[in-house]
């Protein structure tokens, strides 16, 4: 949604003429980005997985504290990117998807089990499951610090 919004702005559409309709604002309970780790790798390298998640959290914390520096770092890796545009995209993501009330209260990385169960149920309205998914097969907090990753 942020890319579409910013593309319209770049094309000269006045921002007051653009409405962004977020599915989450209308009851869709899905989670977004996730770190996916091969279960065998995680079992064999639990400390590495834990340290990686802590590093991801530190990166987010730095990006939240200084979105301009984060955008500049991105442009160093992708010279075709526009730093001002990427900073704006990052800020939109931080405001709407990263620093949520849940994350502020519970840290980053964990899930609300009731929400996750609702998300699985909502997906079943579109997809026919051969077996009912077991949420425990798709998420573990075993590699997260107690209380999640604090972004405060």
PLM regions and their residue ranges:
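Ligand-binding "clamshell"
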Residues: 7-23, 84-88
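Short, catalytically relevant binding-site loops at active-site mouths
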Residues: 3-4, 25-28, 41-42, 59
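A bilobed periplasmic-binding-protein/Venus flytrap-type ligand-binding module shared by bacterial periplasmic
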Residues: 31-47
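Short coil/loop linkers at secondary-structure junctions
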Residues: 14, 80, 129-130
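Secondary-structure end/capping motifs
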Residues: 44-126
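Conserved C-terminal helix/tail region of periplasmic/extracytoplasmic solute-binding proteins
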Residues: 116-152
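Short linear loop/turn motifs
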Residues: 21-23, 88-94, 134-146
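Bilobed "Venus flytrap"/periplasmic-binding protein-like clamshell domains
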Residues: 1-10, 27-32, 117-118
